[in-house]
Amino acid sequence: MSNFTVKVPLSERMADVLISKDRWKDDEEGYLKVKYGLEIILINVMKFAIVYGISLATGLLLQTVTVHMSYLWLRRYSFGLHATKTLNCTLISLAMFVLAPFVFQNIPSNNWIVLGTFAFILLNMFLFAPADTESLPLIGEKHRKTLKRKAMIGTLILTGIALLIPFAEMKTLIMVGSLFQVISINPLSYKLLKRRYRNYEKYE
């Protein structure tokens, strides 16, 4: 007899507990879709709790929120790489939203640095946004052009916020979050991680 047992992820076990399979016995496909969606929600909730729990415990909540919101503001339309494993995603999130704010929290920046940095970010948005993934190909040239335009407008808005905000250290944190998003859409990042770039080409 084999002693090998398959280790079921915690999120999957929790989803099984929360969803009654008996209610979906006549719709296996529907059950799997709902279960998968619930797993994604649970994974994100747990990741959020870990990142913000550590941030709160270390007194970095404001810094974490600043970096995270800047990152999400640009990511909304420019998309970009996702980690393929939950553990990797959590570790990367801790590095980006807890460790990086800790390192950069006391480094001030002036508006000339802001302008230079965001000029670089805007160029990357023009060249590379939006960037898709294997699991989320961005199909349709018109759709991609719309996303690119919105990503560039979002970059300009964030530039204005960074220029107007009176706290020099906050300017730095906004730029850090924005640069993380630039890394996630850059073709070099895809190449280094051996991920496929321009996944939409497979469907068009």
From Swiss-Prot:
EC number(s) reported in the record: 3.4.-.-
GO BP annotation list: proteolysis; quorum sensing
Top-level taxon of the source organism: Bacteria
MF terms in GO: peptidase activity
Mode of membrane association: Multi-pass membrane protein
InterPro entries reported in the protein's UniProt record: AgrB
Protein's cellular compartments: Cell membrane
UniProtKB keywords: Cell membrane, Hydrolase, Membrane, Protease, Quorum sensing, Transmembrane, Transmembrane helix
Chief place where the protein resides: membrane
Regions annotated as coiled coil: none
Pfam family, one: AgrB
Transmembrane regions: 40-60, 87-107, 111-131, 156-176
Cellular component, GO, one term: plasma membrane
Protein family according to the UniProt entry: Belongs to the AgrB family.
HAMAP family: AgrB
Task performed by this protein: May be involved in the proteolytic processing of a quorum sensing system signal molecule precursor.
This protein's name: Putative AgrB-like protein
Annotated organism of origin: Listeria welshimeri serovar 6b (strain ATCC 35897 / DSM 20650 / CCUG 15529 / CIP 8149 / NCTC 11857 / SLCC 5334 / V8)
